[in-house]
């Protein structure tokens, strides 16, 4: 049996990214199997792994009427994922990807269709709610829509969510995913989702930023230094997110090779701030460079792809695999629900991924190819809507409904007992967030999730804490036609 010695290079990556990439785990003697790999145990040779699938490397010519081809490929993938012995439901956030999947589903089948969406209430609800778009899409295609009400009193959910995930995981979408999976799983055993559309069709702001960064990196170093000096003078607006900090890192002179630049976009809590977070006794044992080494290795393994392909490849191998897919699958299975991901189907990926960068994205327009393919199929409002992301309003929750909980979990006495973190630094992060001087939701959520996980997996006997069949939180659901 493996010892429960913590792997602090892996955990440092967790505090940097919000998740732990495979093959690492929180424990030094435990490893995960990477996606697209098989593992074979032989009595004499021991354990060996082999990669059996990867994203295609070669470019393919862009066919004429590529938008029509993409629409057909999407329909084929959704139809393949509808094959089931039991009724199928769908997650519908109102965003472009889930709307595209539901539209294809409606075109493929005349059977009754039922989708579920999140409706937020309380602190920060307006910033997260996409119910109006979900309602419009459901009405356009005759889909029964159940709105799952999400209130900010989620304190009792965090422990069962953490235990379902098995390891520290700081993605703020965990709470709405849990409540939606709970609601869907009460009536269905299979559900479609729109996961994977951002990674396949270049839907994140970081993809545009990455391409801009490639042009910026070609400027003379003296120009870069001047722009960086001006950016350093920018003050972060009260209550601002990470945007100003990321801009400063983006404009840093000679801001690294392609994998390091992309890692900068994914980083939630950078060095040296992260290094200062740790207790003095721990700092010398944390290199702070584990994620960079891992990203560079992935990049070289795939032949150092250029342009947008580098960003999309790293997104697939890191964020999609170890954050989004891992979280959604584990939470859904905690409710005996199988989620299906037609936008991650290997046949669709093998057709779309090798297409030209210029087809997929414009200088200021993400998902250009997908939006053109869906023109006439989705309402114009869906095609123009800004991206929000499927996350709850955790910044507001931490300032209000969850404030007492995080104050308890990160109390100086508990931190001193754990011995991992500097209580003064943590207190400063809390004060920054509560006073709205800075938005510290990302690192505070990561610390909160780690504390809950540590109590269940390190401080208690090694037996896995049970995941309740149902949490005490009962979401309010209402159906609309």
Question: Where are the regions that the model predicts?
Answer:
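Short, solvent-exposed loop/turn segments at secondary-structure junctions
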Residues: 96-97, 120-122, 152-155, 197-200, ...
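Phosphate/oxyanion-binding loops and surfaces in catalytic or ligand/nucleic-acid-binding neighborhoods
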Residues: 18, 36, 108, 140, ...
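Active-site adenylate/phosphate-handling loop in enzymes that bind or generate adenylated species
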Residues: 179-238, 319, 324, 328-348
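Short secondary-structure boundary/capping segments
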Residues: 162-164, 205-212, 464-465
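Short, polar/flexible loop-turn hinges at active-site or ligand-entry regions and domain interfaces
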Residues: 1-6, 24, 60-61, 167-170, ...
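Adenosyl-5′-phosphate
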Residues: 3, 8, 25-35, 45-47, ...
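Cysteine-centered catalytic environments shared across enzyme families
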Residues: 1-165, 177, 181, 375-376, ...
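Active-site proximal helix-loop segment of RNase H-like, two-metal nucleases, encompassing DDE(D)
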Residues: 165-168, 410
């Amino acid at each position: 049996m493996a010892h429960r010695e913590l792997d602090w290079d892996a955990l440092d990556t967790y505090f940097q990214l919000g998740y732990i990439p495979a093959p690492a785990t929180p424990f030094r003697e435990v490893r995960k199997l990477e996606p697209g790999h098989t593992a074979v145990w032989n009595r004499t040779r021991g354990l060996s792994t082999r990669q059996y699938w990867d994203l295609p490397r070669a470019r393919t010519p862009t066919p004429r009427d590529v938008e029509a081809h993409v629409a057909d490929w999407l329909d084929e993938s959704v139809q393949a994922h509808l094959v089931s012995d039991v009724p199928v439901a769908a997650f519908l956030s109102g965003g472009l990807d889930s709307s595209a999947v539901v539209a294809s589903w409606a075109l493929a089948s005349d059977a009754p269709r039922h989708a579920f969406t999140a409706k937020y209430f309380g602190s920060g609800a307006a910033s997260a709610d996409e119910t109006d778009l979900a309602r419009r899409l459901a009405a356009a295609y005759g889909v029964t829509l159940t709105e799952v009400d999400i209130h900010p009193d989620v304190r009792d959910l965090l422990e069962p969510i953490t235990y379902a995930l098995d390891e520290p995981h700081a993605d703020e979408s965990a709470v709405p995913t849990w409540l939606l999976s709970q609601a869907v799983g009460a009536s269905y055993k299979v559900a479609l989702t729109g996961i994977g559309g951002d990674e396949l069709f270049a839907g994140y702001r970081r993809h545009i930023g990455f391409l801009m960064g490639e042009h910026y990196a070609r400027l003379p170093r003296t120009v870069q230094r001047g722009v960086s000096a001006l950016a350093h003078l920018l003050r972060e607006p009260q209550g601002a997110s990470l945007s100003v900090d990321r801009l400063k890192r983006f404009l840093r002179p000679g801001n690294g090779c392609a994998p390091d630049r992309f890692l900068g976009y994914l980083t939630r809590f950078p060095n040296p701030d992260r290094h200062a977070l740790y207790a003095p006794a721990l700092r010398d044992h944390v290199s702070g460079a584990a994620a960079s080494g891992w990203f560079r290795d992935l990049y070289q393994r795939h032949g150092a792809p250029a342009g947008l392909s580098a960003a999309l490849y790293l997104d697939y191998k890191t964020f999609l695999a170890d954050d989004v897919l891992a979280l959604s699958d584990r939470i859904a299975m905690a409710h005996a629900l199988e989620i299906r991901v037609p936008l991650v189907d290997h046949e669709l990926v093998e057709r779309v991924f090798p297409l030209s960068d210029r087809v997929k994205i414009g200088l200021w327009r993400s998902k250009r190819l997908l939006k053109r393919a869906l023109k006439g199929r989705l309402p114009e409002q869906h095609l123009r809507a800004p991206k929000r992301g499927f996350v709850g309003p955790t910044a507001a929750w931490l300032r209000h409904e969850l404030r007492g909980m995080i104050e308890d979990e990160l109390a100086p006495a508990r931190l001193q007992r754990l011995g991992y973190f500097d209580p003064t630094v943590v207190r400063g992060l809390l004060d920054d967030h509560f006073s709205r001087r800075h938005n510290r939701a990302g690192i505070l959520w990561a610390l909160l999730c780690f504390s809950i996980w540590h109590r269940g997996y390190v401080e208690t006997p090694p037996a896995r804490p049970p995941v309740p069949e149902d949490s005490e939180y009962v979401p309010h659901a209402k159906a609309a036609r």
